[in-house]
From Swiss-Prot:
GO terms for molecular function: ATP binding; ATP hydrolysis activity; four-way junction DNA binding; four-way junction helicase activity. It comes from Verminephrobacter eiseniae (strain EF01-2). This is Holliday junction branch migration complex subunit RuvB. Residues 5-194 are annotated as: Large ATPase domain (RuvB-L). Homohexamer. Forms an RuvA(8)-RuvB(12)-Holliday junction (HJ) complex. HJ DNA is sandwiched between 2 RuvA tetramers; dsDNA enters through RuvA and exits via RuvB. An RuvB hexamer assembles on each DNA strand where it exits the tetramer. Each RuvB hexamer is contacted by two RuvA subunits (via domain III) on 2 adjacent RuvB subunits; this complex drives branch migration. In the full resolvosome a probable DNA-RuvA(4)-RuvB(12)-RuvC(2) complex forms which resolves the HJ. Residues 9-22 have a biased composition (Low complexity).
Amino acid sequence: MTLQTDDFAPAPARRVVSAAPASPQEQAIERALRPKLLQEYVGQVKAREQLEIFIGAARQRGEALDHVLLFGPPGLGKTTLSHIIAAELGVNLRQTSGPVLEKPKDLAALLTNLENRDVLFIDEIHRLSPVVEEILYPALEDYQIDIMIGEGPAARSIKLDLQPFTLVGATTRAGMLTNPLRDRFGIVARLEFYSAQELARIVKRSAGLLGVPMDDAGGLEIARRSRGTPRIANRLLRRVRDYTQVKADGHITKDIAERALAMLDVDPEGLDVMDRKLLEAVIHRFDGGPVGLDNIAASIGEETGTIEDVIEPYLIQQGFLQRTPRGRIATQAAFRHLGIAAAPGAQAPGLFAV
């Protein structure tokens, strides 16, 4: 007899279409596929053009680039851009994240070790603690930090000069940044979801680096189901590569991509089992809505935070779900996609339709 307690409950399976940060093994693969320079970077045309100008000007003057804030959904290339910025400037990159910097001394140790014009990348910068953020303000404005020496009545503050540097902050939740911190970034770039055509170019480049022969149609099929996100596109490419290696001749065609992605339960709109489960619950159990988030969570056995932060955003962006003051409503597009008699009220087509 097998006994199982909550302490040893299996972790939930990772969704193949999740844009969440990758596992360590996947991060290593991502680094190998990452473009190194702006000319290799696909998509984000506006942000790329702005950075080309600002980086070029800073390089010509021999100055540190203004501090850069990159924000947008996960998996769109914020970390990649931070590496590219450092490479284009020809300087070192130091990388950390907001939750890691628990105390002022953690940040001070990083800042005092930066060389002239170096880049400091802080991921999840919205999660900096207030006390650490206070230390950062004078560092960003004046390249100085105040640190406390000693304790009690003998404690005193000393000012340390820093080398001019560039902070690149990345966040998926720009609204959670405090106004004082946001105002200290001279360059702000929003990263948008990619079109299927842009993702097809990324998939083609990645396939070449992985040594996988692939038709353009096969690459486009992977791109169409990648939810506008390069991280997902590269993950699906690797899974399709595995499929064709075992089930076919190693060459990715449109037919092979379709069969592999069907096996992974990723449909032509990029929806997986969990997406469809949510839509079906709203339609079948709650007559299409409106229905509250707590009721949806109870009906599909997921936490409200997971639904709100992980599942819902893509369904809303694609026009399958509508968030209203009275609750969630399944749109006509959702009824059509699931092959159910459509409810009244047409919605706009999805963002990534080809």
